[in-house]
A protein has these predicted regions:
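Active-site and substrate-binding clefts of carbohydrate-active enzymes
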Residues: 16-39, 45-50, 54-169
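Conserved beta-strand positions
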Residues: 2-3, 77
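Extended, H/D-rich, highly charged conserved domains that either
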Residues: 4-17
Length: 169
């Protein structure tokens, strides 16, 4: 499972390890580093950001500066970050293109989720009992269920669940 590395779920734990589900130890969990992910997807072209401008060598330097025992840095973002949230004029594509060479210089490699869960053992369990989102600061569903109309629509939709399950087509 790929999910948000929200502070209210992790507590004191780091998102930079492989975890497993509290209810199913065979189900591995990879947690998004929201700060490093948002540095690209949200802040990259923000000239008011204290780290602006962001270059690939600087970004990889941040990752290389993390404690060596932290095994995995998960950077997840929506594809819309490349060209929409971060316009092409911001040089976002040149930044992304430069990342592999900068990472190689620092001995940092890229891996798929499958490669990560195959290579690394889980260090602990994580319990994620509620839906999460990376859409807002709360890292929950409040941005979609934050007002009366949204909650009413949600509740109406789920009120027919029993009837939907009775259908056989």
């Amino acid at each position: 499972i790929l999910t948000e590395g929200a502070k209210h779920v992790l507590g004191w734990k780091s998102p930079h390890y492989v975890y497993h589900c509290a209810y199913n130890p065979n189900l591995k969990i990879l947690l998004r580093d929201f700060k490093l992910s948002d540095d690209i997807s949200l802040r990259f072209s923000n000239s008011d950001w204290s780290e602006y401008p962001l270059f690939a060598d600087k970004y990889i330097g941040w990752i290389a500066g993390l404690p060596e025992e932290e095994q995995v840095i998960n950077i997840f973002m929506e594809l819309s970050a490349l060209g929409i949230a971060q316009p092409l004029s911001s040089n976002i594509l040149q930044f992304i293109k430069a990342l592999p060479a900068c990472a190689k210089e620092k001995g940092i490699s890229f891996s798929t989720p499958f490669e990560i869960v195959t290579k690394f053992k889980s260090v602990d369990q994580v319990d994620v009992p509620y839906p999460m989102s990376w859409a807002d600061e709360e890292r929950d569903t409040s941005c979609w269920l934050g007002n009366v109309m949204q909650r009413e629509a949600f509740n109406k939709l789920y009120s027919v669940a029993g009837r939907v399950h009775l259908c056989d087509d």
